[in-house]
Amino acid sequence: MSTESMIRDVELAEEPLPKKAGGPPGSRRCFCLSLFSFLLVAGATTLFCLLHFGVIGPQREELPNGLQLISPLAQTVKSSSRTPSDKPVAHVVANPEAEGQLQWLSRRANALLANGVELTDNQLIVPSDGLYLIYSQVLFKGQGCPSTHVLLTHTISRFAVSYQTKVNLLSAIKSPCQRETPEGTEAKPWYEPIYLGGVFQLEKGDRLSAEINLPNYLDFAESGQVYFGIIAL
């Protein structure tokens, strides 16, 4: 190889290589748009999550003196609970001064007749059709057991306007004495309460009565022991 050829090769090797031409301008623009779209979607998603979970957003107004906001539903329930009930109701008590009979009174403490219920001839008069809770309690008391068997009965009856017949709705029988008190032994007192209660469909004008068979055994020592009532449901 000649000297001139070697010199030419060295000069060619020292020349810098040509730079690669850059990518087209359109590819850079697409990359920028993609990056911007990603950031926009990510930001919107983050904002939605923060609003959804209550991290940011309108804050509840604090009321003075520790008062709390009440929803319209709660206000409706609260106001309706204060509205006086227009359903028929009655609660009568026994007259402790009536000897030998069970007489009901409505003008005594803890007794009432409301919204159309009447007490006539010792019976409660139903003012309107519907379901009613009927209840009654009596308390019997005795001293010792006689030779004859003692059976105590308590009955709630209905005289319906539709068939003009007296029908027993509720009834119970109890026997306080299992055997006669032997002669010469101390006669111990006994007590027998009877409670009756049930729900019935009644008609306007029906008459309800609560009766017993042996009123002489009734105990009137304390108030609230003998009563009779109805409540419209």
Swiss-Prot record:
Annotated localization: Cell membrane
Processing and modification events after translation: The soluble form derives from the membrane form by proteolytic processing. The membrane-bound form is further proteolytically processed by SPPL2A or SPPL2B through regulated intramembrane proteolysis producing TNF intracellular domains (ICD1 and ICD2) released in the cytosol and TNF C-domain 1 and C-domain 2 secreted into the extracellular space. The membrane form, but not the soluble form, is phosphorylated on serine residues. Dephosphorylation of the membrane form occurs by binding to soluble TNFRSF1A/TNFR1.
Sequence ranges on the Extracellular membrane side: 57-233
PROSITE patterns: THD_1, THD_2
Disordered: annotated span: 1-25
Residue numbers carrying Phosphoserine: S2
This protein's record includes keyword Transmembrane helix: yes
GO biological process: antiviral innate immune response; cellular response to amino acid stimulus; cellular response to ionizing radiation; cellular response to lipopolysaccharide; cellular response to nicotine; cellular response to type II interferon; chronic inflammatory response to antigenic stimulus; defense response to Gram-positive bacterium
Lipidated positions per record (N6-myristoyl lysine): K19, K20
Biased amino acid composition, Basic and acidic residues: 1-11
Glycosylated residues (UniProt): S80
SUPFAM superfamilies per record: TNF-like
Membrane topology: Single-pass type II membrane protein
Occurrences of domain THD (ranges): 88-233
Residues the record marks as site: Cleavage: S34, L35, L39, L40, C49, L50, L51, H52, T76, V77
MF terms in GO: cytokine activity; death receptor agonist activity; identical protein binding; protease binding; transcription cis-regulatory region binding; tumor necrosis factor receptor binding
Subunit structure as annotated in this protein's UniProt entry: Homotrimer. Interacts with SPPL2B.
Entry-linked PANTHER family: TUMOR NECROSIS FACTOR, TUMOR NECROSIS FACTOR FAMILY MEMBER
General function of this protein: Cytokine that binds to TNFRSF1A/TNFR1 and TNFRSF1B/TNFBR. It is mainly secreted by macrophages and can induce cell death of certain tumor cell lines. It is potent pyrogen causing fever by direct action or by stimulation of interleukin-1 secretion and is implicated in the induction of cachexia, Under certain conditions it can stimulate cell proliferation and induce cell differentiation. Induces insulin resistance in adipocytes via inhibition of insulin-induced IRS1 tyrosine phosphorylation and insulin-induced glucose uptake. The TNF intracellular domain (ICD) form induces IL12 production in dendritic cells.
Similarity comment text for this entry: Belongs to the tumor necrosis factor family.
Protein name: Tumor necrosis factor
Native organism: Canis lupus familiaris
